[in-house]
């Protein structure tokens, strides 16, 4: 996209569903709220009332993720194996929660981009590392496009590197 992007593991101890982790493009000199605010002008209750002059300057991230999913690495898909609409999209590893009553994450998500911009949505792409009973057997860490266009995902839960290939029509 020509822009700098990042994924952020937001703060803990505000509950199961706060604060959302996120993926966003980075604006030079931009203020994303830390440590006083999150997701726009929402005060962290531990800093309530501090720095009111910054409240309206907080940039809202492009894509909000489930809280505590621990987005660790992302790549922009530059292969040709997957359907054409995946070209340039973000694939991000979600390592998984450690401090929620119900686990979340443990997957790879796809963030569709249009003209280098995110719409705010993401899609589950590679799942199954978390069983319906809540047992974890894998934790995605790294994600990269292989020379053949497949997606490689490292997993420190099982000690594996997974290759995701597309075999359908393009």
Map each language-model feature to its residues.
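C-terminal structured "cap/appendage" subdomains that terminate the fold
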Residues: 129-149, 153
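Blade-level signature of beta-propeller repeat domains, shared across WD40, Kelch, NHL, RCC1
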Residues: 144-170
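Short alpha-helical basic/polar micro-motif
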Residues: 72, 141, 159
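Beta-propeller domain segments
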Residues: 1-126, 132-138, 164-170
